């Protein structure tokens, strides 16, 4: 019975405006967007929610979300992994979470063509991508974070690294729009893509039970064409529940 109800819901059209309105209701006066009322905020999901606001037509609210990012950025270009009501809840500095501001900034520009606001966000985008690239290893992968004690955690995550590729592409697109060149970002992107394509052993394989590790190299634009189709086909039966969708975690 539960499965039938779930499938029925999946056949309904998504009301984008209603979804964006719910995000706007959760947003705090500061611009911060937590997971849900009275819960934590992380920089990646905050930016994702800001893009949802833009898609739903809540452009002023989206701007407030990006201004919150600009205001809370650390001097080294990072953000902390979690905040609660404006206070730091987790001092881990995550490379992927920090880089994602580039995706949000470019998304807002593509929807509004507001070059002035893009220019306003540019310093934050620059510092964020430099922070992430400073965690790149000689082999191309990017270490996932700096711990609250200030130590680099030399573990690389495939999903996070794939997301960073998208962030770097968006950062390069912003740079081009504003008349800047960033050869270090181009080189870092190429090295990271090469690691994802050709050095899977550089990434934490224990995460392979998560569907994100399956599809993120495609979603991030690293694998395309026949390579993408092969990857999708290889684990389709493992992660896809026909008629329902993709399971988040596969436990045999």
Regions found by a protein language model. Name each.
Residues 57-129, 133-136:
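Helix-terminus loop motifs that line ligand-binding clefts
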Residues 40, 44, 96-99, 155, ...:
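Residue signature of alpha-solenoid helical repeat architecture, marking inter-repeat boundaries
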Residues 1-44, 55-79, 132-133:
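Low-complexity, Ser/Thr/Pro/Gly-enriched N-terminal "stalk/linker" regions
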Residues 120-166, 175-251:
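Extended ligand-binding clefts on enzyme/binding-domain cores
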